[in-house]
């Protein structure tokens, strides 16, 4: 089992080391292969998945077997069928890995515990707002962009993500050296 580290998710940056040690047991590490389903329609949904690495898509499949993608989730984003999660109902959506993906998941009960015990409601509210904005932008794109423009927009996001990961992984020394190097430029 992979041990969760404080630098794995932005969520943990706002916590003291003591708080991190207390919150760590609530998160369950799960690894998925490209093509795996994290959530399938008609399943109970009792977890939120925070993406450590990889790429997933959340989609709906209609009665004619047509697939409509609702969202993509990258590193440090979270995803689930939120309606099913919060209403304790069966999923109508599918969450599938487009790449090999690592996640840290939170069970519904644990999600509520950490919201209250660690005062993280503001963090999850901001995540929700960012997700809502991304959904609105996606809907606008669907309504106004050609298939080619939609694909180009997706590629820009993917390229930006890869560049961000390159920068993140570029320097492996102490953080204090990184901050000093940033100031020198």
How would you label these PLM feature ranges?
Residues 35, 46-59, 64, 75-76:
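Glycine- and acidic-residue-biased ligand/ion/polar-headgroup-sensing regions
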Residues 80, 137-150:
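Short, Lys/Arg-enriched anionic-surface-contact patches
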Residues 48, 103-104, 162:
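A residue-level structural signature of the nucleotidyltransferase/glycosyltransferase Rossmann-like core
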Residues 38-43:
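Short phosphate-coordinating micro-motif centered on Lys-Gly-acidic
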Residues 69-129:
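Cyclic-nucleotide recognition modules
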Residues 5-7, 131-140:
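Short, Lys/Arg-enriched N-terminal segment that forms or immediately precedes the first helix
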Residues 1-28, 84:
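Cyclic nucleotide-binding regulatory module and flanking cytosolic helices
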Residues 145-185:
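Phosphate-/nucleic-acid-contacting segments
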């Amino acid at each position: 089992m992979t041990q969760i580290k404080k630098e794995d998710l932005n969520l943990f940056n706002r916590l003291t080391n003591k708080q991190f040690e207390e919150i760590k047991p609530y998160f369950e590490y799960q690894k998925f292969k490209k093509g795996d389903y994290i959530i399938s329609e008609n399943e109970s949904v009792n977890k939120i998945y925070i993406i450590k690495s990889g790429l997933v898509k959340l989609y709906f499949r209609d009665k004619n077997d047509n697939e409509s993608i609702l969202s993509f989730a990258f590193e440090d984003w979270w995803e689930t069928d939120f309606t099913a999660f919060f209403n304790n109902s069966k999923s109508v959506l599918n969450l599938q890995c487009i790449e090999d993906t690592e996640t840290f998941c939170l069970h519904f009960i644990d999600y509520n515990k950490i919201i209250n015990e660690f005062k993280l409601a503001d963090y999850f509210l901001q995540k929700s707002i960012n997700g809502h904005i991304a959904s609105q932008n996606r809907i606008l794109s669907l309504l106004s962009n050609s298939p080619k423009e939609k694909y180009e927009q997706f590629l820009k996001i993917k390229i930006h993500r890869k560049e961000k990961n390159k920068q993140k992984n570029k320097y492996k020394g102490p953080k204090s050296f990184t901050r000093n190097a940033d100031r020198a430029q």
